A protein has these predicted regions:
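Gram-negative outer-membrane beta-barrel transporters
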Residues: 315, 420-422, 441, 446-539
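Transmembrane beta-strands of outer-membrane beta-barrel pores
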Residues: 67, 84, 100-102, 111, ...
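Face-selective signature of the C-terminal outer-membrane beta-barrel domain
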Residues: 151-169, 191-337, 353-355, 412-415, ...
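Predominantly transmembrane beta-strands of Gram-negative outer membrane beta-barrel pores used
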Residues: 60-71, 77-85, 92-138, 145-153, ...
């Protein structure tokens, strides 16, 4: 429900903020970066189907769509700072969740007798494959995740904690469908099976003193992604796709916060670490009119370093505040990226309470983000890191933001904010001259192509929001965003032109309305309705798509990039509702919930599917009029249109 966040129409958990892609957001848990937030993540593009983070374990969440803290780097569109609560210091507490599509257990407990060391943990497992099988969907996902925090108070001024977050995911094809329709056949034709796992383990030490605090965090994360597909989905036949990759990071950061330095507040720190990427790929490709097998192996390691500082002060009885920040990042990946002065990231935030209940705020900043591992580690057929040779650089984004907020009382807030984002040095594919962050939701990796850092873009718009935490015992959130998201279409020589075209996230309109009401007898009803303007799309290249070698390589149609995003789908909207009932007993409580997504079964007409006709045995039919081509047909395709009901019980003790 946050302003400027696009809700996708295909049951995904992608966070698309103010016209930026899902890979432009960064997430932190207790000060430790979380590179993979979602199950079934798209490598190089972030996003995914469901969040790994169990919100029951969180104490607070700060979501920044601008004016990012200097301590948190490597993001272009948003930063989410999540903080976990500590475990219960006096007694064991637990919670069981048994739903129609998942199971979970949470517990928090003292570990030491004096309660100074506590443990908070959760484990969840989905069995969506059962629900999806009943619904006749062509893929059957299963995911598991775990999360924990071990916290210890070493004294009045010192604290130590360990955190962990991880997942194990498996998505297999539903090849047992009886009489699959064309839509199901199409998905079964191109979608590979997928195994993913990820983990983040980190440790933090906090020392508090009279004038501030010192925090040191160390962490390691890893993400493993395996994709494979067999001819005709028959596992006795050879694999046509065999993709195995692992990426990992080791990180350390130290920061000091001083609450009063001559009336100023100062935060500063340093950090460093290393990154590692391994990739073994075997996949079909269609180039130069020939079907071939693309093979490459890549191993990459490099170092990172960062430096940041923030200085802030309040004036005029705390009515006016100023914050100055500076950050610099660098890596040993290449000469283009090793000098942190090239990635100097200044920022200025202003806030002025010019009248009671009225506040004006503004910020201007430059942010930098590393290109995805898939681009950094891509090698050509001779083993050369081709993108390193092409001068791959950090992606840059300049933000200009201003807004006014009115706070009539302690429960409500009304605000309007305008934003302008300017992108530069975006990696552009040498294959289709498009930014590597683009790609439809059928893509399972993004960025593993030859690129050059020549892309430019812009996103701008205005947001209006209203929030009331006690409107007739109801929490109400309403937000509307009007935006444009575009990139500069390079010319044939990849030089910038004056032509701007819509990005994949140029939806123009975003409307979110949500409410949670508490009734008597411990009933709670929540509802969320959201509307997203029509997404742009690119027409198919019929001639290329129908070529037998081209279709056999991809099992999907090819786009006519000369007409990139020149068409637009209709708007999408959806209503989700949830009802909860709780019964309280002496030492435990029982809860029951019903959750329904897409209550009124709205279906949006998507881009038609272009696919070959098949004969009675399921083989593609050649076009007798065009040798070397398949006979093609179009199939209507709806986005959404699935009511997802679930119910469950919770037991807390």
């Amino acid at each position: 429900s946050a302003p400027g966040v696009i809700a996708t129409a295909i049951q995904r958990n992608d966070v698309l903020v103010r016209g930026g892609g899902a890979n432009e957001n960064k997430y932190y848990l207790d000060g430790i970066e979380i590179p993979v937030l979602n199950h079934f993540a798209v490598q190089g593009g972030s996003g995914g189907n469901a969040s790994l983070v169990n919100t029951d374990l969180l104490r607070s969440v700060n979501f920044y769509t601008g004016a990012f803290p200097a301590a948190f780097g490597n993001g272009l569109s948003s930063v989410m700072d999540m903080r976990m609560r500590d475990g219960n210091p006096t007694r064991f507490k637990g919670k069981l969740i048994l739903g129609a599509s998942d199971f979970g257990i949470n517990f928090d407990t003292p570990v030491s007798r004096n309660g100074k060391t506590t443990l908070l943990a959760s484990y969840r497992r989905s069995y969506l494959q059962m629900l999806f099988s009943v619904l006749g969907l062509p893929f059957l996902p299963t995911y598991n995740d775990y999360q924990f925090k071990l916290a210890s108070k070493l004294g009045a001024s010192d604290e130590f904690y360990l955190i962990g977050l991880g997942s194990f995911d498996y998505n297999r094809l539903n090849t047992g469908l009886k009489d699959p329709d064309d839509d199901q056949k199409y998905i079964l034709g191109y979608l590979p099976e997928n195994r993913q796992s990820s983990y983040v383990f980190g440790a933090g030490y906090v020392h508090r003193f009279r004038a501030g605090q010192l925090r040191v965090v160390v962490s390691r994360n890893a993400f493993t992604n395996k994709l494979y597909k067999h001819e005709r989905n028959d596992k006795s036949l050879p694999r046509t796709i065999d993709y195995n990759t692992e990426q990992s990071d080791n990180r350390v950061r130290a920061e000091i916060e001083l609450r009063s330095v001559g009336g100023f507040r100062f935060t500063g720190g340093v950090g460093g670490g290393s990154g590692h990427y391994d990739n073994t790929t075997r996949r079909p490709a269609y180039t130069g009119g020939q079907l071939r097998t693309e093979r490459f192996d890549s191993r990459l390691s490099f170092g990172r370093y960062e430096l940041f500082a923030t200085l802030s002060r309040e004036f005029f009885g705390k009515r006016f505040s100023v914050l100055l920040g500076l950050r610099a990042d660098g890596t040993t990946y290449s000469s283009e990226m090793h000098n942190p002065l090239r990635q100097l990231s200044p920022r200025l935030n202003l806030s002025y309470n010019f009248r009671p209940q009225w506040t004006f705020s503004a910020s201007v900043a430059r942010y930098y983000q590393e290109p995805p591992y898939t681009s950094m580690g891509y090698r050509d057929s001779t083993g050369v890191l081709i993108n390193k040779a092409n001068g791959l650089r950090y992606i840059a984004s300049d933000h200009f933001i201003a807004g006014i907020a009115f706070t009539p009382d302690a429960h409500s807030r009304i605000s309007v904010e305008g934003f302008y984002k300017r992108y530069s040095d975006y990696p552009v594919s040498l294959i289709d001259s498009l930014p590597v962050s683009t790609g439809d939701f059928a893509d399972y990796t993004i960025g593993d192509v030859p690129v050059r850092s020549v892309g430019k873009g812009r996103a701008y718009g205005v947001e209006l929001s209203y929030r009331n935490t006690n409107l007739a015992n109801t929490v109400v959130n309403v937000s509307y965003t009007f935006l444009h998201s575009q990139f500069n279409r390079p010319g044939a020589d990849l030089r910038p032109t004056d032509e701007y075209v819509s990005s994949d996230w140029d939806v123009r309109h975003i409307l979110n309305v949500s409410a949670i009401h508490k009734f008597g007898r411990n009933w709670t009803l929540g509802a969320k309705w959201y509307l997203t303007g029509g997404s742009p799309f690119t027409p198919y290249d019929f001639g290329l798509s129908s070529q037998t070698g081209a279709w056999d390589a991809r099992q999907r149609p090819y786009y006519d990039y000369a007409l990139y995003n020149s068409r637009r789908l209709q708007a999408f909207h959806q209503l989700d509702v949830r009802a909860d009932k709780v019964w309280y007993f002496a030492k435990w409580r029982l809860g029951f919930y019903v959750d329904i997504q897409n209550l009124y079964n709205f279906k949006a007409a998507g881009q038609d599917i272009l696919m070959p006709e098949t004969d009675a045995s399921g083989q593609y039919v050649p076009d007798p009029q065009r040798p070397g081509h398949y006979k093609m047909k179009t199939v209507a395709h709806d986005i959404g249109g699935t009511v997802l009901p679930t119910l469950g019980i919770t037991v807390e003790f």
